[in-house]
Amino acid sequence: MNASGNDTPQRIESLSNPLVKELRALRSHKGRIEQRRFLAEGERSLAEAAAARWRAELLLVAPGAAHGVVPADRTIDVTIEVLEKITGRDNPQPHLGVFAEPDASARNLGALNARGAARWLMIEAPRDPGNLGSCIRSADATAAGGVILVGDACDAYSIECVRATMGSIFAVPIYHATRDEAVTLLARWPGESVATAADGSVDYAEIGFTAPTMLVIGTEAEGLSSVLRGACTRVARLPMLGRAESVNLAVAAGIFLYAAERAQR
């Protein structure tokens, strides 16, 4: 229902409308921190939000696009130019949702139920939002309990990361931890904790992945810190059969998640 008290969508055509500036700020980390909101583009991602019982604060709809792709407090018809201005894309998706970020208190490690899922993913200091988004998508595909971001991580709710998740951001809980908090979690983890490293002592295919398994991965450039590596019960490697020395973060995460899923069937 709009400010007039009816269900007719509002319309915004002017690029100087204050709401355009307000939503454009959500492209920056500072803007998301201040507003505690994030953007999600496209009918597919918004359908995933609806399936996961999320409700948008705002739904912006381009001319000719369907309304009602996700439950929303307000629906606003906008021009393609307005969507371009907000998203920074030349060919934006015709749907743009604005969502409140999850309550931080519900996503701290104290709220994590280790036995609530057979596998979990911990990533230390991921920097690339596209890679992180792909990891979140793989976590969703393998029914992981959640993704724990350790240390100086990129923002999981940036428009680039949300885009890369293809809607999985709405299905996978995201937790944040300091390195010390992560070490404490691993020390009391009730199942197996498996670190990944090029010089791991065992091939990943030889691991039983006792549930609940925590998979612990570092970045391709820096690898996993010795502190987190030392806190894990196993250190596994992926065989490099060609000239490549490593695979990127998202590929490694996908391989290990599916290896754990297969072992735990």
Task: Locate each region found by the language model.
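N-terminal positively charged helical leader segments and presequences
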Residues: M1-D90
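Short, hydrophobic beta-strand segments that form beta-sheet elements in well-ordered domains
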Residues: F38-A40, E57-P63, I174, E192-A197, ...
